[in-house]
Amino acid sequence: MGKPTGFLEFGRELPKKLDPSVRIQDNKEFVLNDEFGDKINEQSSRCMDCGVPFCHNSCPIGNIIPEFNDAVYRDSWEEAWNILSSTNNFPEFTGRVCPAPCESGCVLGINLVRSHFHKGQ
């Protein structure tokens, strides 16, 4: 699944967004996906083959997240679309408004909290 050491090599990154003072001038896209494009494969490689995908359980619509991330990592965009659309009729809409409860279910998130706890933060 993806890159076995991806979660060790790459930190979590989010796409950049336009400054709100620029956003209010029009109704255009404010997430700068073009700049993030080269990082998509890197970020999808962070998905581990954890055995029990708690992220899948945490998703209210049941998206098959590990398989989707693997398809993105391999540049299999049609397969990724098929995986998403098998559980979600409108992934292009829900992806914009989703609060990402899968991330809190991810084993990486659990380990991050634990490591911060041990550091006394």
Model-inferred region functions:
Residues 1-121:
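Ferredoxin-type iron-sulfur electron-transfer modules and their immediate structural context
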